[in-house]
Amino acid sequence: MKYVRYIAAESLRMYPEPPLLIRRALESDELPPGSGGPDGVRPKITRGVDLFLAIYNLHRSKDFWENPDTFDPDRFDRPFENKGVQDWAGFRPELLEGQMYPNEVASDFAYLPFGGGQRKCVGDQFALMESVVTLSMLIRRFDFELTVKPEEVGFYTGATIHTRNGLPMRVKKRVFPGKSETEGGEASKSEPVKAAGSAVAA
């Protein structure tokens, strides 16, 4: 199940929900070292200003991720550091000991699909566990085949990321030898579900 958990985590890295977070400064402050432009000036934040945090861009940044546009669930088992980013501690898998999923602590706030700190989503662990259990049950019982080219799916963003035209798939029920459809066993072949070929929107 560890690999399935990492698949869910990597999916949220590449397509975070939401792709943008908004925070309001309670007090005037300035951003930490390394956050300024080429001149090194640290931007000042005025009390009451709304800050838009581009999580999608953060998760796709080469500063914080190795090959960021590649789907690679195993990346969460590998340390990654970038001395060019001032005061960033890097991604440290050892900090995930006892944790089921990657988090902002192990990534020093480079991984924020649910936010981080005191304002982090309180349901993050439940949401991840629910998605992993659901995914595991589905892929055990069905085979899924995308009926369009991946580049044809398309995305658009609002409060969350959506597929532009749904996610058309051909779904086939997996058949287990010597077992009824409701019993377990090892899969031997696939048979089309009655609704095979219909579009399944994600």
Please give the residue ranges for each predicted region.
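Conserved cytochrome P450 K-helix E-x-x-R motif and the immediately C-terminal K′/meander segment
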Residues: 1-39, 62
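Hydrophobic, well-ordered secondary-structure elements that form the walls
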Residues: 11, 48, 71, 117, ...
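Conserved cytochrome P450 K-helix/beta-meander segment immediately N-terminal to the heme-binding cysteine loop
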Residues: 15, 53-101
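Conserved beta-strand elements of beta-rich interaction domains across eukaryotes
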Residues: 19, 50, 57-59, 78, ...
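Residue-level recognition of short, solvent-exposed, well-ordered loop/turn junctions
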Residues: 44-46
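Cytochrome P450 heme-binding "Cys pocket" and the immediately downstream C-terminal segment
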Residues: 106-107, 116-120, 124-162
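C-terminal helix/juxtamembrane-tail motif
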Residues: 162-202
